[in-house]
From Swiss-Prot:
Annotated binding of Mn(2+), by residue: N181, E247
Group of enzyme by EC: lyase
MF (Gene Ontology): 3-octaprenyl-4-hydroxybenzoate carboxy-lyase activity; metal ion binding
Origin species: Paraburkholderia xenovorans (strain LB400)
Subunit structure comment from the entry: Homohexamer.
Name of the molecule in the record: 3-octaprenyl-4-hydroxybenzoate carboxy-lyase
Pathway: Cofactor biosynthesis; ubiquinone biosynthesis
Keyword annotations: Cell membrane, Decarboxylase, Flavoprotein, FMN, Lyase, Manganese, Membrane, Metal-binding, Ubiquinone biosynthesis
Keyword Membrane appears in the UniProt entry: yes
Location(s) in or outside the cell: Cell membrane
Gene designation: ubiD
A Pfam family the protein falls into: UbiD_C
Keyword Transcription regulation applies: no
Length: 522
């Protein structure tokens, strides 16, 4: 189903009972987090906080708080009563589309060639289009009117350093790339028009910024932040879209209609384009540092001094409660100065919180897991299923089910998964099992680990690999180890002993007891 903007999606969710309006006053300082967290853990609806007692904007939370709503946002019309299972299965179709876009199969005949041409035409037809007089610029704040405190920016946890923008789609462009990049990076409010842009070094926005700083030293770097885009654009920004395809174009494929874009209004930022029907847009720059920077506070990490981007204004970010369930360490990141804010009339502020799983990012991880499966299966045909348990912070542990064909096969799959997609670079643990193990059932996974693993033989340890900066368990920030566990049945060459034979009841006996079951009343 097509959703032309966030409001269209909100209306659809309300119609099918997936959204609840909250008229009571709920503060964006801690209270919204507590309420959203309780509702999400109960599998409840999205929440629209309508009271304007504290701010002039309604706040939308828990938008993607269930896999079904993620599927709906991706254009899959999950029917009422189907539950999350049906929605997850339908998301594999999105993965198959991505797989075809990432590595198209060579045509084996006229029929295949026709399908390939149809796909290419579909991608071509979804090229974004620029519109004039966009709704996202119905209201414009400039000069002293630009005050981020006028927005209902959440403070999520008691130990947070301050208010935090959590669902902003950051739009950047590198000097050597034709397409714009969309990324979601949290942004700490530190002044009337200043935010800290927390993007890690490997993320698209940080790479664009670094390339710009190298080629344009001393020049301000333009950035736009979108708050409240249509669901296809939001989800396109968190999906592993091939580098040759823009997130806007992929959003068009999900939506079934071209993404309408608008040029930013601020001179110097007008080379960036944002969704024309977005609720709120922040336009501005990351400016070069003027004068000598103030010294780092006692006990804080040192300021960045290496690289062209170090010459730009930075600030100490955090601590904040994160998706790990802990407060993260402080670190230096660039400062984004907002020069102009544009918005729709009666704009909606879209927000979320992160915390110990399950939270909204964990739900997104469960849904995107199904998108990953076809991508992995195309590269590794032996993989029969793949699961990122949400308890593992969505990506730190992966369980792989495979059809094993030779000794050492499981180890090959481990290294393949670690190296295949950027999304798995930070996966610390991989457990590989056979086809007879349901990888979504912890009881079966633990059974396989405890009965099919010899720790010395079946454990793979890899030291000094890229690791999540937020992973305080690693000895060095951003660098740590990985573990692979081969919980498959062992083949000759992997063991000298006779391997165990699983206990299975006779099929005729099972059928006989099935026929008696209702009579027994057990």
């Amino acid at each position: 189903m097509k959703y032309k903007d966030l409001r269209d999606f909100v209306g659809r969710l309300e119609t099918i009972g997936e959204l609840r309006r909250i008229s009571q006053t709920v503060s964006p300082v801690l209270e919204m987090t507590e309420l959203c967290d309780r509702v999400l853990r109960a599998g409840g609806p999205a929440l629209l906080f309508e009271s304007k007692a504290q701010h002039a904007f309604p706040v939308l939370g828990n938008l993607f708080g269930t896999p079904r709503r993620v599927a709906l946002g991706m254009g899959v019309d999950a029917q009422a009563g189907e539950g999350d299972g049906a929605a997850l299965e339908s998301l594999r179709d999105v993965g198959r589309l991505l797989s075809a876009l990432k590595e198209p199969e060579p045509p084996k005949g006229l029929k295949d060639a026709g399908k390939l041409l149809s796909l290419a035409k579909a991608v071509w037809d979804m090229a974004p289009k620029t519109v004039s007089a966009p709704p996202c610029q119905e209201i414009v704040w400039e000069g002293n009117d630009v005050d981020l405190a006028r927005l209902p920016i959440q403070t999520c946890w008691p130990g947070d350093a301050g208010p935090l923008i959590t669902w902003g789609l950051t739009v950047t462009k590198g000097p050597n790339k034709p397409r714009q990049n969309l990324g979601i990076y949290r942004q700490q409010l530190i002044g009337r028009n200043k935010l800290i842009m927390r993007w890690l070094a490997h993320r698209g926005g940080a790479l664009d910024f670094r390339e710009f700083a190298l080629q344009n030293p001393g020049k301000p770097y333009p950035v736009a932040v979108v708050l409240g885009a249509d669901p296809a654009t939001i989800l396109g920004a968190v999906t592993p879209v091939p580098d040759t395809l823009s997130e806007y174009q992929f959003a068009g494929l999900l939506r079934g209609g071209r993404t309408e874009l608008a040029k930013c209004l601020t001179p110097g930022v007008d080379g960036l384009q944002v969704p024309a029907r977005a609720e709120i847009v922040l336009e501005g720059f990351i400016y070069p540092q003027e004068g000598a920077p103030s010294p780092a506070p006692a006990g804080a990490p040192p300021r960045p001094v290496k690289g062209a981007s170090a010459a730009y204004e930075h600030a100490l970010e955090g601590p904040y409660g994160d998706h790990t369930g802990y407060y993260n360490e402080q670190e230096w990141f660039p400062v984004f100065t907002v020069e102009r804010i544009t918005m729709r009339r009666d704009a909606i502020y879209h927000s979320t919180y992160t915390g110990k799983p399950p939270d909204e990012p964990a739900v997104l991880g469960v849904a995107l897991n199904e998108v990953f499966v076809p991508l992995l299966q195309k590269q590794f045909t032996e993989i029969t299923d793949f699961y990122l348990p949400p308890e593992g912070c969505s990506y730190r542990m992966a369980i792989v089910q495979m059809k094993k064909s030779y000794p050492g096969h499981a180890k090959r799959v481990m290294f393949g998964v670690w190296s295949f997609l950027r999304q798995f670079m930070y996966t610390k643990f991989i457990v590989v099992v056979d086809e007879d193990v349901n990888i979504r059932d912890w009881k079966e996974v633990i059974w396989a680990i405890t009965t099919r693993i010899d720790p010395a033989r079946d454990t793979v340890l890899v030291d000094r690999t890229p690791i999540d900066y937020l992973d305080f368990a690693s000895p060095v920030a951003g660098l740590g180890s990985k573990m692979g566990l081969d919980a498959t049945n062992k083949w000759p060459g992997e063991t000298d002993r006779e391997w165990g034979r699983p206990i299975v009841m006779d099929a005729a006996v099972k059928q006989r007891i099935d026929s008696l079951w209702n009579e027994l009343g057990l």
